[in-house]
Amino acid sequence: DDNEIYVKKYSDVIEILTQNIEKITAEIITRVIEDISIKAREDFMKLPKPYRKEDVYPWRFNRAYSFNRRPIIQRDDEIIWGNRQLYHMMEYVTGLIYNGTYSTKDKKMSKLIGKISNQRGKLFNNRIVEILNDIGEFQVYPNRKKINKKSICNENGETLGDIDVLFVDVSEKRIYVAETKAFPFSRNPYEMYLEYNEMFVDKGKKKCYITKHKRRIEWVKNHLHDVCTELKLGNTDLWSVIGLFIVEEPIISNQVYNLNVEIISKAELSLERIRKVN
């Protein structure tokens, strides 16, 4: 029953599960229960290691030590839970992993999240390519590593990264250099702050997404002859190069911090909207 709250001895739960689930040990069950449990502590604001003090702040989203991620309560030798909250936890954690926002220090989990995030990014890029093709006004060239046999790199030979989507509006004589990112929606001020830093703020040698994007746009402008040669566009003097940043969800920090950077969400993508970009 989803509405029931269950209270059972820890040892009884382990015994029941080992008897009813094949190829599972008491050690594995214990590790799982410990990973999704909350225990009593002398000071509510003090969490056991390796958790951070921020993991107890109720206004923070995606806390490693929250009831959303730890729906079981341990009390002495008993555990208390509800099936509905357990199911919610599975959906919630799966969503965090898929969105690449699951906080973990486990190397294997971090590697898995990175792999899933990369795949999600590729799928999003493919979807944007489909939308641009469906508009019917563009010549679309995804995932460009080289232009006219020249690598996209700076004067020192250091790579500037691939161009996610290069597309051409022949009737308007425009070449668009598009960066695509499947960022999750920022749900609170802290996530907005992280989004702002990742998107717009350079930190030493680590450059933000906008800076990297601008460098690729500049490369295309400096190699316009190569672009026109490879894409058979004719006279370079007729063409202008436009940068475009396409995201899955609106970048709220762009408005909050009054940055006015030209960013288009997937839902906005249309011929009219694209042609408004300068």
Name the predicted role of every residue range.
Residues 1-278:
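Intrinsically disordered, low-complexity Ser/Thr/Pro/Gly-rich regulatory segments
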